[in-house]
């Protein structure tokens, strides 16, 4: 059913899945490929599976993957995923909003994680003082913006933010299955970005 995968074509097919050029060099992927490590095959399958979600269309899955690349500051993956997202109909405003969302969530994740750790009345009651106008009327739509915010917050480990954004996604018509699929995209692309 599956053709025999050699070291070269396992790496090549992995790169093709996420639009990285064949000549792209990753020390860690090269080490795994040199050993024909079975994890590369698993990773390729995982990447393909999360990009073919039941509850996310391909454009949405790619924009979530892009949010991971931006969060992890992975320039090669950002470029590759932007191209794939554009091929699925994403425009410059949507791509820019993904970047803005990731940046804002990084501020919020640090701030609210601090509040959560401290459990002190002063910190809990003091105004955050963080401008968040992009959350009011997002180009991507409120439900999807909240879904992106949830994934980035999960990546950054902010329990308060994850809980809040999960409820907001549900309030805006999202489903638990859609949330689960989005977080899976985030998890798999985080695992890939470790190697790239």
Briefly describe each language-model feature range.
Residues 1-60, 71-139, 168-171, 178-181, ...:
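Acidic, glycine/proline-rich low-complexity segments that act as flexible tails and inter-domain linkers
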Residues 61, 145-147, 151:
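Short, leucine-enriched amphipathic alpha-helices that occur as contiguous helical runs
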Residues 67-68:
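Amphipathic alpha-helical segments that form the core helices of the histone-fold
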Residues 137, 142-147:
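Short, intrinsically disordered, charge-biased short linear motifs at domain edges
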Residues 155-161:
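Short cysteine clusters
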